A protein has these predicted regions:
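Short, polar/acidic, helix-capping and beta-turn segments at strand->helix junctions
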Residues: 1-107
Length: 107
């Protein structure tokens, strides 16, 4: 959620557009709400470490999101070594956790 002028409720939409290209190397895109387990009745009530911006809370969220992205990568037969770019949207400083957690996963 944005810090300034946040909407009344969460929302995020993403899409990928692809076209065939001869000679192109295989590629992939993974997107989505990684901070909530899939299949829940609503988003807000199931956010991992909801509202906890302590170092322990942020670390819990980072670990959950990275594990969820690993699950999605595995479903495509991929791993962190295949990832060429990652975008993370947050107002909190998670860099210390991302560095240690990604390296531990072989990224």
């Amino acid at each position: 959620m944005p810090v300034a002028r946040a909407p009344d409720r969460e929302g995020f939409h993403a899409f990928s557009y692809t076209v065939p290209a001869s000679g192109a190397t295989p590629d992939f895109v993974i997107a989505g709400s990684g901070e909530v387990p899939e299949g829940r009745s609503n988003y807000r009530d199931h956010i991992i470490a909801k509202g906890d911006t302590s170092p322990a809370g942020l670390l819990q969220k980072v670990r959950w999101v990275l594990a969820e992205q690993e699950r999605r990568l595995a479903a495509l037969g991929r791993g962190w070594a295949d990832v060429t770019a990652t975008q993370v949207y947050t107002v909190h400083d998670i860099h210390p956790f991302m560095a240690s957690e990604l390296v531990a996963r072989g990224a």
